[in-house]
Amino acid sequence: MRILVEIAYQGNNFLGFQIQQNGRTVQQQFEKLLQRMHKRHVRIHPSSRTDRGVHAIQQYFHFDTELNIPMSQWQYAMNRTLPVDIYVNNVVTVDDDFHCRYDCVGKRYRYKVYQAQHRDPFQRGLKTFIPEPLDLDKMNRAAQQFIGTHDFTGFCSQKTEVESKVRTLYQSEIVKTDDGFDYIVTGSGFLYNMVRVLVAFLIEVGKGRHEVSDVPKLLESKNRKNVPFTAPAEGLYLEKIYLDENELLKDFGNDIKIHRKKSLQND
């Protein structure tokens, strides 16, 4: 039986989602829990692998089990054992051929920034602090330039190992908030550090160090040295996972292209 689990977590005290030899990760917490329940190792398969310090409002993983536990009890059994910075929101059965990575057709991230004269210790780890004034309208116009299908070689980590760095963005916008702004981006998939590099670039635009017209040229250059900065992890949230293409079409229109994964190239 294949089980799909929807979770949320606060990423400050995790070294990321993916299990590591030394260090606390989200995957480690769940596989340790499932091993106690099954008396054997049970591997989980996530929809996305967030980095150290990145939060998730909605994340999914699946696993296979032979345990005869009522579906209504899975959520309770997990939450009573998990640490306080992880919570299971829902547990359902899925078809045996369902795969969290392959069946994911889109993801939405939100990056939160607050602006003030000084740091707020209560925002630590939850939002990124920027003291300088920013031109949010100009940043939003630059953000819109990323919508569509592009090669994001120049806007991801140089450690990115996947062969194709072409991704499709359905949404890319700056939204003003009471204390700063959020950057909201939805796409077919994301490269390593791609969202944080996009944010860092848009902040440079807001400071007047880049122009809106620079975006096409930087995409064309495919040179990360032209976009050298990466925003901190602390303001980044994995906000939504699209497992249903109809939901993606409803949010962004029937004329968008749906990308189904043939390999694990997309983050």
Curated annotation (Swiss-Prot):
One of its GO terms (biological process) is tRNA pseudouridine synthesis. Pfam families: PseudoU_synth_1. InterPro entries: PsdUridine_synth_cat_dom_sf, PsdUridine_synth_TruA, PsdUridine_synth_TruA_a/b_dom, PsdUridine_synth_TruA_C, TruA/RsuA/RluB/E/F_N. It is an enzyme of class 5 (isomerase). Its EC number is 5.4.99.12. The keyword Cell wall biogenesis/degradation does not apply. The keyword tRNA processing applies. It catalyses: uridine(38/39/40) in tRNA = pseudouridine(38/39/40) in tRNA. One of its GO terms (molecular function) is tRNA pseudouridine(38-40) synthase activity. The active site is at residue 51. Substrate binds at residue 109. Keywords: Isomerase, tRNA processing. Homodimer. Belongs to the tRNA pseudouridine synthase TruA family. Formation of pseudouridine at positions 38, 39 and 40 in the anticodon stem and loop of transfer RNAs. NCBIfam families: hisT_truA (TIGR00071). HAMAP family: TruA (MF_00171). This is tRNA pseudouridine synthase A. It comes from Staphylococcus aureus (strain bovine RF122 / ET3-1). The gene is truA.
